[in-house]
Amino acid sequence: MGSTPAGCAILIGKFLCRFVVRSRNMGSIIIPEGYTSRQNIMETEIAIKLIKDFFERELSKELNLTRISAPLFVKKTTGLNDNLNGVERPVAFEMKEAEGEVIEIVHSLAKWKRLALKRYGVNSGEGIYTDMNAIRRDEDLDNTHSIYVDQWDWERVIDREDRNIDFLKEIVNKIYSVFKKTEEMLAQKYENYTKFLPEKVTFITSQELENLYPEISSGERENRFAKEHGAIFIMQIGKMLESKERHDGRAPDYDDWELNGDLIMWNPVLDSALELSSMGIRVDSESLERQLKELNLEERKELEYHRMLLNNELPLTIGGGIGQSRICMFLLQRAHIGEVQASLWSDEIIAECEKNGINLL
């Protein structure tokens, strides 16, 4: 794929960043002033394929991962589904051959991957990744949230001595290098594409961030810090802060809240922070016990997956999810995630997008 004509180039320097983005709220979406999609739908589809193929290949090389097949649904009784913040309802059904067995569409594969690593006999320093597709029926729809989730879910076996902040940062930097390589690839492929990612990620803990901006909400802190630094990794998501609040909710049974975090970039189109990856070193038996107790969810210890963890039957791992559509939206500098994925939207959102030059797929 060579250079595109100026009329359909992905313009950042010439168009999107030549003015200050002043957004007017349209209910659940934001329309950046003067925004218009810079490619038609077919050109966008070609660019999406280009980004996904390149990013997936480079991620696999950086983290030493092998692609495997993944399920769309799991049995509720296994405890393998991701409970997210604990309030989201999974899409559930029964199948004819297993009456009475509740089957759930996955929210993510955070726990399933760890079981797969054991079953497939993956060695330390090696890992797996999947093309994960999920339905999150309770998402609040906006520019960056959809009920359809597509991400690379990855997991890698580690040793006990790797369970520390320095190793977590090392993996984050490897992932960020893939973002930088993908950006460079786009700059070579597209005329007038201006690179905008900073050279490195800035790391901060959720408590340090609260200390820095104690007077504002956690979301506003993310915006403030991301705007200043461009690419940030907020560590220790889910743990209780000194304010007796949590920076954000996180399920107690996959990430160790002391050894996890969110990779967030500053999105100049929407003039806001954008989370592109959530990841962490996973719980061991000790941290699982502690976190379940903290949230009064000790009944989960009776589930098959949790029993295996408490009995130290699963490998120690690090893993996470990287949003495919969000990466495409971000690197192509689109205003709405519906420009890079086919999903369902309210009539109001569709009407506002059509009126304001946003081409939903």
Listing of model-derived features with the role each one plays in the protein:
Residues 46, 50, 54, 163-170, ...:
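Generic recognition of stable, solvent-exposed alpha-helical segments in well-folded globular domains
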Residues 125, 130-220:
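Extended, charged alpha-beta segments that form solvent-exposed binding/catalytic grooves
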Residues 135, 205-361:
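A translation/RNA-centric and nucleic-acid-associated enzymatic feature enriched
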